[in-house]
Amino acid sequence: ILHDQYVNNNFYLLIDLGELEVKGQINSNLYEDKECWIYIRYYYLKALLELGLYNKAREVVDNCDNQFNLLNINSNITFEYQYLLADLDHLTNYFQNAISFSQALLKKSSTIDQKIKCQYLYAHCLRHIGEDLNLAFTVFSDLAKSTSYKNDKIRIRSIYSAASIKMFQRDKNYNYKNSFETINEIICNDDKNEIWKPYVIRHKAIYEYKICKDPYMAEKTLREAINLLEVTSLRIKYDIYFELAEVYRIYDNKLNNYEKSLAFYSEAEQFAKRVHDYNLQSNSQLGIMLLNLKYGYEINIEMLRTIIIETHNLNLNINYNYAIYIKCIIANEAIPRELSLYWKKMQYSDLLLYSSKSKSEKYNLKLTVM
């Protein structure tokens, strides 16, 4: 019954039920059946996450007694509940915790489907942090090629995540076309996979811009995605807004492009603030800074200091290095040699490429929400 309510998007009903359980206002006999209790708490938290109420979900978890732990995984629902807690760490910017939790959960997993979910979350958080992109790529590639499972969601996301890392590294030899063709085949084989189209479109646009060097096609692709998403509140819509802002910032020095870029960055930033997504928020703020520098406007130095501190604290390593890059531009300082060597080692190809360009060209650094 609870699952049916979730599938039918009756999130507020599940939240109301969850609130009653948390306040102890539900039938006390419920607690005699631990699995029944877990279902109520699980769908309560799932509903909060669907509505972007990540911090509320965090508060519920932090304020309630932890009535079971990793030693107690003896059914699918207990696994799913623990996996949700690991994903909550990811969604609330505790990436290192999510990595540790997903690795521990992997050891307790009893089915292939459970194992691949843990592996995907592990690689996904590695990609966010950006300190071991090659390991993340290896995990995504293995998941993309594996024939031992049938989870299309994991496969599609693994394929485009692997491609996204190679695009970030500016690998021109990677077979991006094959990746997008494979995803298209998976989507065409099952109508239920249509929901993943906007997510794929985002990466296809980055491919068109960075690898094919065709900003006009990238803009067209992103605009098509917006037409699909305009009436929704899905997070991916704001990722698309961010990518459009990037295209308008970089490819033409026109006043109307400044205004369009600023508007899309601002939409993405405000959404990210609402759901406490500091990855998207800080990238949007850094994009606005590069935009203003390009057009000769002032930037918020105090905000830049905050981004440097917060991205360092949250282990958002790529964002942190973007902020340091901008700090050097503002101070009119050369990029320190040790920093350039670090970017080369980490394969932060855009930072390495644009750090050697003229000052006016430095503003065209392509930012990536990993």
Locate predicted features.
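C-terminal non-catalytic interaction modules
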Residues: 1, 267-270, 274-279, 283-286, ...
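Short coil/turn connectors between adjacent alpha-helices in alpha-solenoid helical repeat scaffolds
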Residues: 2-15, 46-57, 86-97, 124-136, ...
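Amphipathic alpha-helical segments of tetratricopeptide repeats
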Residues: 19-29, 62-70, 99, 103-110, ...
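Structural signature of alpha-solenoid helical repeat junctions
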Residues: 32-36, 73-77, 114, 132, ...
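Residue register of alpha-helical TPR repeats
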Residues: 36-39, 76-80, 117-119, 124, ...
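Structural register within alpha-helical repeat arrays
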Residues: 44, 85, 122, 160-162, ...
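Solenoidal tandem-repeat scaffolds enriched in leucines and small polar residues
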Residues: 114-117, 121-178, 192-199, 203
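Eukaryotic tandem repeat interaction scaffolds
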Residues: 190-313
